[in-house]
């Protein structure tokens, strides 16, 4: 589905269905340099379980036009504008990595529009190494290489996909490679500069779930302590054997966890 948001075309995957006013809505928000396709399994699953699903391409990503937004706050305002364009009063938000910060900011700043959030592969602050930032700014393929190597657990570096012949890291690498020049850098810089996450987390009033990979090297479980302490009564699921790219590494375990708040 293509809609107009702030004068640009925004693409939202809805499982080829119209938004129905009598159904709850789940919005899926992708991470840095990615697009809606990372949520294909999850969005189809929840569409088949009685929900409207809206899996967005952020501006400048995937099929959405416009330039990448500069800050997490701007991205959160854009997500709310998507809800407005679709005449959705409130929704549950599921975000991965950068998307988790966007979901957090939405819940803190627009509490009347958000009924629950699930933060997948998250932490706050979400610091990005100079090596990745510099490579991304230079549009150096090394940025993609580092993110795919560090973004998966060691066991999944060598396979582990239940679908024979499909390489986890290879698919994610190709997704990064499809992103437009500069997109990854804008996203990673937004993560790095969003320093108010724990303050905003204290304002969250809706049910909140953190889904973490036990072997995540980009947002390690130990780094989430401040976030867990700031959010009022969060649910926390740590998935054994999973790294940062949880949607790919542990899709079924992630779906099971999401049902706690969706």
Give the positions of each predicted feature:
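Flexible "cap/lid" loop of the alpha/beta hydrolase fold
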Residues: 101-146
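Short beta-strand element of the alpha/beta-hydrolase
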Residues: 22-31
């Amino acid at each position: 589905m293509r809609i107009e948001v702030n004068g640009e075309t925004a693409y939202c995957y809805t499982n080829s269905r119209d938004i129905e006013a009598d159904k709850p809505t789940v919005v899926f928000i992708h991470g840095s340099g990615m697009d809606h396709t990372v949520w294909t399994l999850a969005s189809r699953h929840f569409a088949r379980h009685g929900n409207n699903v809206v899996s967005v391409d952020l501006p400048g990503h995937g099929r959405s036009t416009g330039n990448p937004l500069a800050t997490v706050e701007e991205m959160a305002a854009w997500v709310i504008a998507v809800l407005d364009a679709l005449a959705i009063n409130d929704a549950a938000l599921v975000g991965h990595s950068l998307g988790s910060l966007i979901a957090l900011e939405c819940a803190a700043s627009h509490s009347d529009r958000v009924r629950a959030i699930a933060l997948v592969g998250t932490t706050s602050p979400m610091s990005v190494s100079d090596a990745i930032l510099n490579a991304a700014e230079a549009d150096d393929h090394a940025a993609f290489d580092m993110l795919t190597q560090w973004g998966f657990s060691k066991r999944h570096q060598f396979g582990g996909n239940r679908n024979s012949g499909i390489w986890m890291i290879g698919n994610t690498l190709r997704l990064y490679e499809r992103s437009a020049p500069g997109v990854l850098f804008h996203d990673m810089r937004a993560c790095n500069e969003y320093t108010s996450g724990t303050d905003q987390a204290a304002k969250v009033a809706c049910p909140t779930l953190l889904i973490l990979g036990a072997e995540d090297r980009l947002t390690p479980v130990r780094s989430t302590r401040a976030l867990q302490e700031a959010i009022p009564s969060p649910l926390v699921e740590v998935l054994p054997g999973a790294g940062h790219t949880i949607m790919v590494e542990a899709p079924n375990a992630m779906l099971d966890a999401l049902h706690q708040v969706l």
